[in-house]
Amino acid sequence: MPCEAVKQVLNKSVPLECVLSSDRRIASLTPCAGRCSTVFGDAVCRGCRRFNHEVIHWNTYSAEQHRAVWQRLDAQLDQILVPLLPHADLVKVQAFVLSKRVRLRDDASKGRKLYHALKLCEKNRHFTDDSGLGIHYKQVRPLWDEFERRILALATASYDLAFLRADGISQHLIHIQEED
């Protein structure tokens, strides 16, 4: 049975699977990577790659809104990391990540798991052989740097596209109102 604090969180419509996993690890409720650049004016966080309004309003989002953001972020990780790490063994990667007590959502994508494994290796290169990534420890830093460059470019392009769509819709609505 969950503790009283967890019950309170649950009463605020946070799904149980976001709070406790089957082995009592606390699941991540936010994609935050601990280095938010939106506080300095970035439209896209350089850490988690959420849009600035998503960072600001995250705690007010519904479970469905959270899921939509997670899916976009995971799709971006898949698009960048899966091709960068073609020799990765996902079973070993997942076992490695879980052995380091990294919190993963049950629906975490292959790219999300690769991201956490690469991040662990970037901080501790001696983990590389056990990570399942299929790379040499000397490849970690160049791969991490290339990943960071590509993922931020993709996230920024995604933000720009969303902004252009919203602007186009608003311009269309203004035009319709002016005609009436």
What function would you assign to each model-found segment?
Residues 53, 57, 66, 116, ...:
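Histidine (H) residue identity feature
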Residues 24-25, 35, 46-50, 67, ...:
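Arginine residue identity/basic-tract feature
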Residues 1-86:
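N-terminal cysteine/histidine-rich coordination modules
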Residues 4-7, 12, 116-118, 167, ...:
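Residue-level marker of intrinsically disordered, low-complexity segments enriched
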Residues 126-180:
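C-terminal, charged low-complexity interaction regions
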Residues 6, 16, 69, 73, ...:
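Generic structural signal of hydrophobic/aromatic residues within well-ordered alpha-helices
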Residues 31, 44, 108, 129-131, ...:
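Generic detector of intrinsically disordered, low-complexity, polar/charged segments
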Residues 82-140:
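Short flanking/linker segments adjacent to small metal-binding domains or redox-active Cys/His motifs
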